[in-house]
Swiss-Prot record:
Zn(2+) 1 binds at E9. This is Procathepsin L. Important for the overall degradation of proteins in lysosomes. It catalyses: Specificity close to that of papain. As compared to cathepsin B, cathepsin L exhibits higher activity toward protein substrates, but has little activity on Z-Arg-Arg-NHMec, and no peptidyl-dipeptidase activity. It comes from the Eukaryota. Coiled coil: none annotated. It comes from Gallus gallus (Chicken). Zn(2+) 5 binds at D139, H142. It is an enzyme of class 3 (hydrolase). The active site is at C25, H165, N185.
């Protein structure tokens, strides 16, 4: 795998979004991975609907604004035969509506998902290099994460098991001798480094970045 990769430069990544006061990070991680794979196969970058996932993937085990898993959302897209565009099914940051999916606005699909071997940063690196942006879950429960602004994030108290936030790895690189993952968050562009965080890479699966990583098959 190359020493550095940044899928933003290749057109795979939509602008940073904002989940608001709703525990729907899992939906944003899911759409991010699907947007990348749709671009890889179709050559078009289309923003996909998180609200579609929030409202409609309860049968797969997701809980709207109270949390969910990216794999269950990938499963929903497969079960449902697609996901609507952001434009046709806009985000409300609420989960009190019934499913409003409409097949005519279907903008992407998947045929399942691949889980990266648990805790293997090298396998994650290979996947990011060959496939594109990958969904990951991390421990984001520290104030150092909430208030991150720049630099390579390393939190001594970070857990590799207690994961509470779904995000998207869009690449990796190094600065001096320090390696990092390029991570797209869903807290708006004002958070972090223009909405992104650069997280320590190859430091014993820091914050669990490779503990629950996956991507959709398209």
């Amino acid at each position: 795998a190359p020493r550095s990769v940044d899928w933003r430069e290749k057109g795979y990544v939509t602008p940073v979004k904002d989940q608001g006061q709703c525990g729907s990070c899992w939906a944003f991680s899911t759409t991010g991975a699907l947007e990348g794979q749709h671009f890889r196969t179709k050559g078009k970058l289309v923003s996909l609907s998180e609200q579609n996932l929030v409202d409609c993937s309860r049968p797969e085990g997701n809980q709207g604004c109270n949390g969910g898993l990216m794999d269950q959302a990938f499963q929903y897209v497969q079960d449902n035969g697609g996901i609507d565009s952001e434009e046709s099914y806009p985000y409300t940051a609420k989960d009190d509506e019934d499913c409003r999916y409409k097949a005519e606005y279907n903008a992407a699909n998947d045929t399942g998902f691949v889980d990266i071997p648990q805790g293997h940063e090298r396998a994650l690196m290979k996947a990011v290099a060959s496939v594109g942006p990958v969904s990951v879950a991390i421990d984001a429960g520290h104030s150092s994460f909430q208030f991150y602004q720049s630099g390579i994030y390393y939190e001594p108290d970070c857990s590799s098991e207690d994961l509470d936030h779904g995000v998207l790895v869009v690449g990796y690189g190094f600065e001096g001798g320090k390696k990092y993952w390029i991570v797209k968050n869903s807290w708006g562009e004002k958070w972090g480094d223009k909405g992104y965080i650069y997280m320590a890479k190859d430091r014993k699966n820091h914050c669990g970045i490779a503990t629950a990583a996956s991507y959709p098959l398209v």
